[in-house]
Amino acid sequence: IKLIEKSTEETIIDDIDNAQEQTAFVLVDLEGTASMAVASAISRADLVITLCQGSQDDADEAAKTIKLVNRQAKVLNRSIPFAVLMTRTNPAITPRTLKHIMNEFHEAGVEIFKTSLIDREAFRAIRSFGGTVNDLDPKQVSGIDKAVANAHALAVEVIERIKGIKREGGQKHD
């Protein structure tokens, strides 16, 4: 897996192409706002993963991203599969607001990952210490093992989705 984090509108396509030559899976992490870099990355995607926390504001932003994906699909005259990934979820309870948001996505025909990223210190620590959850020091950060298991479950689901998309030849969107 290759992660692309700091591309610009001018370099994003070349960065994706170069990464594809090096690895089977390329993840492009871009800001949530619509931009040419985001549109370019979407146009090259096998799967667009839209992040959403359990708030209506986040759900509204996710909906904007989904609309951008659908516009790009029309421009390119091809299907661009996407799914919503719920983030910073509580492992013990699912608040009513989150249930409502997930139901709205479901009713709109938007796929949601079965795996969510649970709100864990280890995931927040990545921004401070860098690297991945596997690189974190258990003396500095708690819950690494649970974060690794959560990340692994998500990785498995992403890979299975991509394999399914490739088998089916894409996904239809209106």
Task: For each feature predicted by the language model, list its residue ranges.
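Beta-strand-loop-alpha "switch" segments that mediate conformational coupling across diverse proteins
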Residues: 101-134
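Inter-lobe coupling/hinge region of RecA-like P-loop helicase motors
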Residues: 125-152
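P-loop/Walker-type NTP enzyme "switch/lid" segment
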Residues: 1-27, 32, 36, 138
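Conserved C-terminal guanine-recognition region of P-loop GTPase G domains, centered on the G4
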Residues: 62-77
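Inter-motif core of Ras-like GTPase G domains
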Residues: 37-56
